[in-house]
């Protein structure tokens, strides 16, 4: 029987982290708050099709419709006017978050060419992990024939961990493939 990531966290990971870091209360154990998937689209101001195809791709990947982010100020150097779409973002919480994380760990990351693990140095100092992917083709939902251009995306995994060591231990115990540094 395959055990889900949320069940694995509740049954084995919380107890292991509680023993490893000597937490007195179960609520001190780090947990996931949200996962944010972001894609910057500089060309969206000139190419409306790029925005539409990116929205469709992120909807397929996450199962949730992304929010269009717009420019707050006009910047002549970047040829951006105020209120022009410049990116899209999705915030995943609860079951969709665990489902996406399980798919990322077990299906998506192993499909990267020459994959030797992800860097353990991408923590922000507060236990949150940031990951940049260079292409959307590694996701099983994306069909190679239906994309117009290869675009990357950023994934931020937000946890309640106080330190990077706690966040690293949480992700390692859930099976995140970190490379040995």
UniProtKB/Swiss-Prot annotation:
Gene Ontology terms describing biological process: translation
Molecular functions per Gene Ontology: rRNA binding; structural constituent of ribosome
Source organism superkingdom: Eukaryota
Cellular compartment(s): Plastid, Chloroplast
Keyword Ribosomal protein recorded: yes
InterPro entries with a match to the protein in the record: Ribosomal_uL5, Ribosomal_uL5_bac-type, Ribosomal_uL5_C, Ribosomal_uL5_CS, Ribosomal_uL5_dom_sf, Ribosomal_uL5_N
Keyword Chloroplast included in the entry's annotation: yes
GO cellular component: a single term: ribonucleoprotein complex
Primary subcellular site in the record, as a coarse category: plastid
A Pfam cross-reference name: Ribosomal_L5
Quaternary structure annotation from Swiss-Prot or TrEMBL: Part of the 50S ribosomal subunit; contacts the 5S rRNA.
Family of the protein in this entry: Belongs to the universal ribosomal protein uL5 family.
Matches recorded under NCBIfam families: PRK00010.1
Name of this protein: Large ribosomal subunit protein uL5c
Organism the protein comes from: Porphyra purpurea (Red seaweed)
């Amino acid at each position: 029987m395959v055990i889900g990531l949320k069940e694995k966290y509740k049954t084995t990971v919380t107890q292991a982290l509680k023993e490893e870091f000597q937490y007195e209360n179960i609520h001190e154990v780090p947990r996931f708050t949200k996962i944010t998937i972001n894609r910057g689209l500089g060309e969206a101001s000139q190419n409306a099709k790029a925005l539409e195809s990116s929205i469709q791709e992120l909807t397929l990947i996450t199962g949730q419709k992304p929010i269009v982010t717009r420019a707050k100020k006009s910047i002549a150097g970047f040829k951006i006017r105020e209120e022009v779409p410049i990116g899209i973002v999705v915030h995943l919480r609860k079951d969709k978050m665990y489902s996406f994380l399980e798919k990322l760990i077990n299906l998506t990351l192993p499909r990267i060419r020459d994959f030797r693990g992800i860097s353990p140095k991408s923590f922000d100092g507060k236990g949150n992990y940031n990951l940049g992917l260079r292409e959307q083709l590694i996701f099983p939902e994306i069909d190679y024939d239906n994309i117009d251009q290869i675009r990357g995306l950023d994934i931020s995994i937000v946890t309640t961990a106080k330190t990077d060591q706690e966040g690293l231990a949480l992700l390692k115990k859930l099976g995140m493939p970190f490379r040995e540094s």
